[in-house]
Design a protein with these regions (language model features):
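Outer membrane beta-barrel transmembrane domains
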Residues: 136, 141, 145-260
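Surface-exposed loop and membrane-interface regions of Gram-negative outer-membrane beta-barrel proteins
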Residues: 33-64, 168
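Short glycine/proline- and aromatic-enriched beta-strand/turn motifs that initiate or cap beta-hairpins
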Residues: 1-25
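Strand-connecting loop/turn motifs
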Residues: 26-30, 69-73, 108-112, 149-153, ...
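Residues that define the transmembrane beta-barrel architecture of outer-membrane proteins
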Residues: 13-19, 53-59, 92-98, 134-142, ...
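Extracellular loop and loop/strand-boundary signature of outer-membrane beta-barrel proteins
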Residues: 6-9, 45-51, 85-90, 127-133, ...
Length: 260
């Protein structure tokens, strides 16, 4: 399967957008694997006093397992990435990173409550929230909520999340490149990424919690559309996001059938 996506996030710090190309393979009904590469387009707000940047991010690979059960559905994935992005632009931590994620859910008619928990050495981006920074340091991440099936192609997700780091943390800004001074004045609401390119500190530096809302629409089998909102409580940051995804294998496979 070949998949192309374009995602963006906008808040008071500016806009972060990602064009991602990926390829995946399903070995059977339970196991799959994939690789991909993102390209970032970052446009900081005028308050940071910095210019827009762009470039390739970290190449990543994922292995995934999924098991459906009448009692409880479970999926797990392990993603690793190499430091191919430019850390001076905030496109990489300069280190190899991993993320182990686990998800449990159960269908109750139109409601599908879920719990998502994982461990990583870098805060993972989500479809709701492309953070204006990347991080390096061990952490656990949690999300719980429910998917609501509004129709056969429209769904709403409501959830809360928590980022729980431990030990030394390094925060690398995507809106203040290396060599730039960033926002003048002191750090507000813990947003060190507005003032300097790189900050190292304790777990409180990257600790975060908040709420998400996401509306997903799939008008065609090969087309996925998303519109999301995130409120970061720790950083007092409101973000609006969008996503457009195209399953190229499904799209071109359908076109071949039409030609025949």
């Amino acid at each position: 399967m070949f998949y192309e996506s374009f995602e963006g996030d906008s808040n008071s710090d500016g806009q972060v957008m990602i064009l991602s190309s990926s390829a995946g393979y399903h070995f059977n009904q339970h196991f799959s694997a994939g690789v991909g590469i993102p390209i970032y387009f970052d446009h900081p707000s005028s308050t940071t006093g910095t210019a827009s940047t762009s470039g390739v991010g970290n190449v990543f690979a994922t292995v995934r397992g999924e098991w459906k059960n009448p009692l409880l559905n479970y999926s797990t994935s392990l993603t690793g990435s190499g430091p191919t992005g430019d850390s001076k632009k905030g496109l990489s931590t300069g280190h190899a990173t991993f993320d182990w994620d686990n998800r449990f859910n159960h269908d109750f008619g139109v409601l599908t409550p879920f719990v998502d928990l994982g461990a990583s050495n870098s805060i993972p981006d989500t479809r709701y929230f492309l953070r204006p920074f990347t991080s390096y340091g061990y952490l656990a991440h949690f999300e719980a909520g429910t998917d609501i099936d509004l129709s056969h192609s429209l769904s709403l997700t409501l959830s809360g999340y928590d980022i729980a780091p431990w030990g030394t943390q390094t925060l690398i800004s995507r809106v203040v490149p290396a060599g730039s001074s960033g926002k003048a004045g002191g750090v507000t609401h813990g947003r060190a990424f507005e003032n300097s390119h790189q900050t190292t500190g304790t777990a409180s530096l990257t600790s975060d919690d908040g709420i998400n809302a996401d509306l997903s629409f799939s008008p065609k089998p090969y087309l996925d559309l998303d519109l999301g909102y995130t409120r970061s409580v720790h950083y007092a940051l409101n973000s609006v996001s969008f996503g457009v995804g195209v399953n190229l294998s499904s799209l071109f496979g359908k076109q071949k059938q039409l030609v025949k």
